[in-house]
Amino acid sequence: MQVIKLQILFTPELVHRFFIFFLIISTTSCGVFKKSKKISPRDGVVYYAKTYLGTPYVFGGNTKAGIDCSGLIHNAYRMQGYRVPRTVDELRKKGKRISVDRAKKGDIIFFRTSKKRKLTHAGIVVENKNGIPKFIHASTSKGVIISSIGNSYWER
């Protein structure tokens, strides 16, 4: 009978490799790495629009260097895979009219900011509590901000 003697050498490199292997196995099996949570298209539109907060107003602009209200809407929807028109006038033709108190996150709301009957401004609803929406928009004086419909300026 012949006896074979095996000698295993635990070199520092081998120990290090085993440690890394067991670390990877233990962290993945313990749920340390969580799957990313999917967000709704409405949440995605609002999330992306909020990345423009503080961006200055520039008529016809559509970048972080300067943006107008329809540029903000166009970019936020485009990042979610939607093709929407670039002007307020064209945007208003695409949707259906609902009452302001029914507006949901991600909906587009329109305003007349002059005495003319034409709609000249728009924003994206970020929330609607008790029928009073808050919306993100590009203000000519303050840049991209969040405002409330309850503000007297928007009630006129």
Q: Which residues make up each language-model segment?
A:
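Post-signal peptide N-terminal segment of mature Sec-exported envelope proteins
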Residues: 34-59
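Sec-dependent bacterial lipoprotein signal peptides
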Residues: 1-28
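Catalytic cysteine-centered active-site loop
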Residues: 56-105
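Short, Lys/Arg- and Gly-enriched loop/turn segments at beta-strand edges
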Residues: 116-122
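Aromatic- and glycine-rich peptidoglycan recognition patches
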Residues: 31-37, 41, 82, 96-98, ...
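Extracytoplasmic/secreted envelope proteins and their assembly/folding machinery
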Residues: 42-46, 50, 70-74, 103, ...
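Short polar/acidic secondary-structure junctions
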Residues: 114-116, 128
